[in-house]
Amino acid sequence: MALRKTHPLLKIANDALVDLPAPSNISAWWNFGSLLGLCLATQILTGLFLAMHYTSDIATAFSSVTHICRDVNYGWLIRNMHANGASFFFICIYMHIARGLYYGSYLYKETWNVGVILLLLVMMTAFVGYVLPWGQMSFWGATVITNLLSAVPYVGNALVQWIWGGFSVDNATLTRFFAFHFLFPFVIAAVTVIHLLFLHETGSNNPAGINSDADKISFHPYFSYKDLLGFIIMMVALTSLALFSPNLLGDPDNFTPANPLVTPPHIKPEWYFLFAYAILRSIPNKLGGVLALLASILVLMLVPFLHTSKQRGLTFRPLTQILFWTFVANVIILTWIGGMPVEHPFIIIGQVASFLYFLLLLVLSPLAGWVENKALSWA
């Protein structure tokens, strides 16, 4: 028998990457899981090389990033790949979640819930990472977002000062954020293994949403090569962005060193957090906004329990398809609103879009599933 099937270590890899039975009809939407693995590996690698030259001290952090870009061999490339790699990470994660929502993959509850935890970890990692260059938006973003914890009743202020390590965002804050930013990707890698462990208990879902045991093919060579094609497409796109317009998705304010005495005119996070930021801002109450922000992500954990349809995916459900694409459009609108100033008409658009975000997920989708069941029973 082949060594890969008998060796204690190799057989784990073999069962996950070589002899894994996979549905023969899974589309390119099933590529994003492996792409996220590639993103994580790329981010850890580029991040490691950046950490070799970065200093987590408020006096030198900004200069050390400048030094990386100017003086370190290919430092500019490593930094641009890392910064834009984060954007690609989130593009892939949102596509991966959208695929899960569309095809009913969330019915694998353990896999789905571990996935939501992974999303929270990635968001947390990206947030602390954005603070590290110690530019204006780094500093003020850290100040604004950590300040939200002061909305927690009774312990809020103590909590904020505990996280800051003082009475404001200062050196202690930057140092601990660097420590967290270095640590979390390895935690993410560990949780990813758990995510895969649960997935391999059930096997992959497929676009038809039906049992595929009768028609399985081996992961290698079919999907290993399919994943490789995905890798090539993504890496070409990432390197193109990093080489041709590395600052396209960044904020110009972050080219100015952090200054606690000057507040930027518009404080906003990176594009991938704007939808949640818009939901946060749409509620004119601090605690309410914080709860809505949390709910915007945690609502995903409720999705499996709100599945009413007799069918798994949306492939043959035109009514819910309309709701799904409305939801996608709505998230895009929220992303746009999150980057806009708090003034008319953006305030009301943001409030309507935020309301619609929760309405679509919690009320309309389960309702549509029920209606479709009724329609099927009449047919």
From Swiss-Prot:
One of its GO terms (biological process) is mitochondrial electron transport, ubiquinol to cytochrome c. InterPro entries: Cyt_b/b6_C, Cyt_b/b6_C_sf, Cyt_b/b6_N, Cytb/b6-like_sf, Cytochrome_b, Cytochrome_b_C_euk/bac, Cytochrome_b_N_euk/bac, Di-haem_cyt_TM. It comes from the Eukaryota. Heme b b566 binds at residues 96, 195. The cytochrome bc1 complex contains 3 respiratory subunits (MT-CYB, CYC1 and UQCRFS1), 2 core proteins (UQCRC1 and UQCRC2) and probably 6 low-molecular weight proteins. One of its GO terms (molecular function) is metal ion binding. It is a multi-pass membrane protein. Heme 1 (or BL or b562) is low-potential and absorbs at about 562 nm, and heme 2 (or BH or b566) is high-potential and absorbs at about 566 nm. Component of the ubiquinol-cytochrome c reductase complex (complex III or cytochrome b-c1 complex) that is part of the mitochondrial respiratory chain. The b-c1 complex mediates electron transfer from ubiquinol to cytochrome c. Contributes to the generation of a proton gradient across the mitochondrial membrane that is then used for ATP synthesis. GO terms for cellular component: mitochondrial inner membrane; respiratory chain complex III. Keywords: Electron transport, Heme, Iron, Membrane, Metal-binding, Mitochondrion, Mitochondrion inner membrane, Respiratory chain, Transmembrane, Transmembrane helix, Transport, Ubiquinone. The keyword Transferase does not apply. SUPFAM superfamilies: a domain/subunit of cytochrome bc1 complex (Ubiquinol-cytochrome c reductase), Transmembrane di-heme cytochromes. Belongs to the cytochrome b family. Its cofactor is heme b. Binds 2 heme b groups non-covalently. CDD domains: cytochrome_b_C (cd00290), Cytochrome_b_N (cd00284). This is Cytochrome b. It is found in: Mitochondrion inner membrane. Heme b b562 binds at residues 82, 181. Its main location: mitochondrion. The gene is mt-cyb.
